[in-house]
Curated annotation (Swiss-Prot):
This is Putative aminotransferase YugH. The keyword Amino-acid biosynthesis applies. PANTHER family: ASPARTATE AMINOTRANSFERASE (PTHR46383), ASPARTATE AMINOTRANSFERASE-RELATED (PTHR46383:SF3). It is found in: Cytoplasm. The lineage of its organism: Bacteria, Bacillati, Bacillota, Bacilli, Bacillales. NCBIfam families: PRK07682.1.
Length: 386
């Protein structure tokens, strides 16, 4: 029967994140710090806009690239927030989540055998999407003492004549690291020197806590070689709506649109109307959620260090990535035993690549009370196992 399956699909492993999430779902009393999803409900005015669109009969296809009014609003949003200039006519595309935007971006540019350089630890989908396109993921190892960030020198060491693109996630999933403008400037010079495309996963851009977020596409000479990937799931608490977008020069955007129109036709209309309302009237809610995440981060990361799990300071997203190297066990074993003994679900760092071994990913996108109870259980687990 395996002869029926694509070689590309057979070489891909199931998501390690879902494995622990699914296991936790079978147990009672579990505090999940596993899946990266806001604990907030989508703002009422955003939900109401979607309901109103249905009541008014907007149930048909939209343009392949998305509602023009939404693309106009995305264009204004990118300009006002991140100093990015993209035309709603031919440089923006609304997608079914940021993951689909990344998928079609990779498929639009990567030929079989071409390489995409990816700093790790990295989000589990990156390798799979590159491999499904026939490409080869090439990893750059990063470490906690350097903030889990790759440098231009790291990319120089990994580049070959087959390199087509580099993929940067800032703020990072799973580490929460944020690239500074100075660091991005150096990486931009590398990209221009070697004429490679930059895939910029900026889904967590709004959730940057300590410094102003910089998009690499805003740097001189970078818009024409960058695809910005973003969406509404994280900052707007709209994970279930599955709505994202990509911003790219028209040549790349049009190539992505070819794939999108055959695979998806368009993103769901009711979700697009919801996102439109979010951009127009939902930024105060985004800011409130951001402030809450910042408070949780400060509490959680400080407490992790106090109980003996060394954790670098994450500048964005809603993840902590503490070291468990002192425990004398693998990250997968640690996660399994913490779940079975104390009913706290975390994700082993190893699922994010070899650089993640010896760490665990903890999402602090849950209530302060849940975080405090999780810390009590984790501290008890550490005392029992050391």
């Amino acid at each position: 029967m395996t002869s029926y399956l694509s070689d590309y699909v057979q070489q891909i492993k199931p998501s390690g994140i879902r494995k622990f999430f699914d296991l936790a779902a079978t147990m009672e009393g579990v505090i999940s710090l596993g899946v990266g999803e806001p604990d907030f409900v989508t703002a009422w005015n955003v939900r109401e806009a979607s309901i109103l669109s249905l009541e008014q009969g907007y149930t048909s296809y939209t343009a392949n690239a998305g509602l023009y009014s939404l693309r106009e609003e995305i264009s204004r949003y990118l300009s006002n927030r991140f100093d990015l200039s993209y035309s709603p006519d031919n440089e923006l595309i609304v997608t079914v989540g940021a993951s689909q935007a990344l998928d079609i971006a990779i498929r639009a540019i990567v030929n079989p055998g071409e390489e995409v350089i990816i700093p790790e630890p990295c989000f589990v989908a990156y390798d799979a999407l590159v491999s499904l396109a026939g490409g080869i993921p090439v990893h750059v190892h990063t470490t906690a003492d350097k903030g889990f960030k790759a440098t231009a020198a790291d990319f120089e060491a990994a580049v070959t004549e087959k390199t087509k693109a580099i993929l940067i996630c800032s703020p990072s999933n799973p580490t929460g690291s944020v690239y500074s403008k100075e660091e991005l400037n150096e990486i931009a010079e590398f990209a221009k020197k070697h004429d490679v495309i930059v895939l910029a996963d900026e889904i967590y851009a709004e959730l940057t806590y300590d410094e102003e977020f910089t998009s690499i596409a805003a740097l001189p000479g970078m818009k024409e070689r960058t695809v910005v990937i973003s969406g509404f799931s994280k900052a707007f608490a709209m994970t279930g709506w599955r709505l994202g977008f990509a911003a790219a020069p028209s040549l790349l955007r049009d190539a992505m649109l070819k794939i999108h129109q055959y695979a998806m036709m368009c993103a769901p209309a009711m979700a697009q109307f919801a996102a439109l309302e979010g951009l127009k009237n939902g930024m105060e809610d985004v800011e409130k959620m951001k402030k809450s995440y910042r408070r949780r981060r400060n509490l959680f990361v400080e407490s992790l260090n106090e109980i003996g799990l060394s954790c670098h300071h994450p500048g964005g997203a809603f993840y902590a990535f503490p070291s468990i190297k002192s425990m004398g066990m693998s990250s997968e074993q640690f996660a399994e035993e913490l779940l079975t003994q104390e009913k706290v679900a975390v994700v082993p760092g190893s699922v994010f690549g070899p650089s993640g071994e010896g760490y665990i990913r903890c999402s602090y996108a849950t209530s302060i009370e849940q975080l405090q109870e999780a810390l009590v259980r984790m501290k008890r687990f550490l005392h029992k196992t050391t």
